Amino acid sequence: MIIHTKYHGQMNIKEEQIILFESGIPGFLEEKQFVILPLSEDSPFVALQSVTSENLAFIVVSPFIFFKNYEFDLDESTAELLDIDNIQDVEVMTILTMAEPFEKSTANLLAPIIVNRKNMMAKQVVLHDSSYTTKHPIGGESC
């Protein structure tokens, strides 16, 4: 399947690479299909690219790279919605807001993206009763 991307131009992807956000992503509820594309070979950062909207791509990363103590409890309804039966199948990502200099970039730890890699279903989850924010600086450990 050929898609047009924000950072890589035209690309050929396989159907099994598509991640389904059944309810969309907050602010982009009509966008349901995304694919993860590396930004470079040796970078932990990847693009979460919409399959249908060329200019819609989020820079995401595993939050554990920058925030070693990051933790939260996944609510049962999300685990059921994503059909999670093994924690080994789960990937957690956080959306970044990039800035210059890089150390001023921030991570949205309040609303992580949860992906079940077994069935490629995902959801952005808003953590309730959390001390995390949408703008944690990634320049230093702060959680």
Curated annotation (Swiss-Prot):
GO biological process, one term: bacterial-type flagellum-dependent swarming motility
Swiss-Prot/TrEMBL keywords: Bacterial flagellum biogenesis, Chaperone, Cytoplasm, Translation regulation
Keyword Repeat: no
Alphabetical list of InterPro entries matching this protein: Flagellar_assembly_factor_FliW, Flagellar_assmbl_FliW_dom_sf
Top-rank taxon: Bacteria
Phenotypic effect of disruption: Greatly reduced swarming motility, less flagellin. Fewer, shorter flagella assemble. Loss of motility and flagellar assembly are suppressed by deletion of csrA. Decreased expression of flagellin (Hag) which is suppressed by deletion of csrA.
Cellular localisation: Cytoplasm
Disulphide-bridged cysteine pairs: none
CC terms in the record's Gene Ontology section: cytoplasm
Keyword Membrane carried by entry: no
Database matches in SUPFAM superfamilies: BH3618-like
Induction (free text): Part of the SigD-controlled yvyF-csrA operon and the SigA-controlled fliW-csrA operon.
Self-association and partners: Interacts with flagellin in a 1:1 complex. Two molecules interact with each CsrA dimer; cannot interact with both flagellin and CsrA simultaneously. Has a higher affinity for CsrA than for flagellin. Interacts directly with flagellin (hag), forms a 3-way complex of Hag, FliS and FliW in which Flis and FliW do not directly interact. Interaction with Hag may occur via the C-terminus of Hag.
Functional description taken from the UniProt entry: Acts as an anti-CsrA protein, binds CsrA and prevents it from repressing translation of its target genes, one of which is flagellin. Binds to flagellin (hag), which is implicated in polymerization, and participates in the assembly of the flagellum. An antagonist to translational regulator CsrA, it binds CsrA at an allosteric site and non-competitively inhibits CsrA binding to hag RNA. Partner switching by flagellin between FliW and CsrA provides a flagellar assembly checkpoint to tightly control the timing of flagellin synthesis.
NCBIfam families according to UniProt: PRK13285.1-1 (NF009793)
Family under the similarity heading: Belongs to the FliW family.
Protein name: Flagellar assembly factor FliW
Organism: Bacillus subtilis (strain 168)
The organism's taxonomic lineage, starting at the top: Bacteria, Bacillati, Bacillota, Bacilli, Bacillales
